Amino acid sequence: DSADLDVIAGATYSSLGLLAAVKDAAQKAGITLKKVEKKAVKAQVAIPAERNYDVVVVGAGGAGFAAALTAKALGVSVILLEKMPQVGGNSLISGAEMNVAQSWIQKELGIKDSPELHAQDTLKGGDYKGDPAVVETMTHGALPAAEWLKNTVGIRYEPHNLFQFDGNSVKPALIPVGQTGTEYITKLSALAQKEKIPVVTGMKAVALIKNKDGRVVGVSCESNGKKYDFYAKGGIILATGGFGANAAMVKKYNPSLDERFKTTDAPGTTGEALYMAQKAGAELVNMQYIQT
């Protein structure tokens, strides 16, 4: 949907060559790239006076918005915090196709699929290193998630069309209009605004706050050199993504991925929240499997 990466802090100059190549390839493929709806992506609230909520979500990409909107729908107070100047993260710059078994388009096209087949393909594609229970939770939850995105969030998908990745037994992937994550982030951001969910950008989480019993009850943040503490009665949700844009961290956990390897991740994908969670007692697993 867009070749305009100005909404990704720090990406503009380093992406000029990539953007030229993308635009050229798009023209040859007959695809029209549109500008990102910057107003929807950037229109975030100022730092609110309220610091106490039922739920605090850290990270305003696709997962963070989904978590915040779900919390709001359940009737609890929620705030969404994002360290970058704009929302979106990797979700914004992704291809955004979504594998969904038994979708409305598969049924229309007469494609036979199932969550079980989706799980088999996923496990095989990951060299069977994935946890089958977790994979099956994902594949069985894909259709309800896609229906929520379409019916509640208002995501538009290409009609009568699906994509098939290498490793898929059949065509399962829904394609958002524009073929990037812009469709997701602009619509999720707009719905968060409509639901009056405070979304604060430029707010970097630096530490989790525990009470005397060792329970995480808040998150300490920094913005423009000032400290802000946000507290949550129900819990803190970390939706901060991975660390593929942190070369030192990548090399630490997978030495074979040294300085020769670049990344497709958004600039903010640097992994500080993983260490923050670890300091609070979380166990980090599978850190060697990294999106590059």
PLM regions and their residue ranges:
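Glycine-rich FAD pyrophosphate-binding loop
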Residues: 73-93
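Short glycine/serine/threonine-rich phosphate/pyrophosphate-binding segments
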Residues: 62-67, 246-247
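Glycine-rich loop(s) and the adjacent beta-strand/alpha-helix scaffold that form part
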Residues: 226, 231-292
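Helical element adjacent to the flavin cofactor pocket in flavoenzyme catalytic cores
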Residues: 176-234, 274, 278-280
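Beta1/beta-strand and adjacent pyrophosphate-binding region of the FAD-binding site
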Residues: 44-63, 79
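Gly/Ala-rich phosphate-binding loop of Rossmann-like dinucleotide-binding domains
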Residues: 68, 72
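Active-site- and interface-proximal helix/loop "cap" or "latch" segments in soluble metabolic
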Residues: 1-40
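Conserved N-terminal/central alpha/beta ligand/cofactor-binding core
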Residues: 86-198, 202-207, 248-256, 290
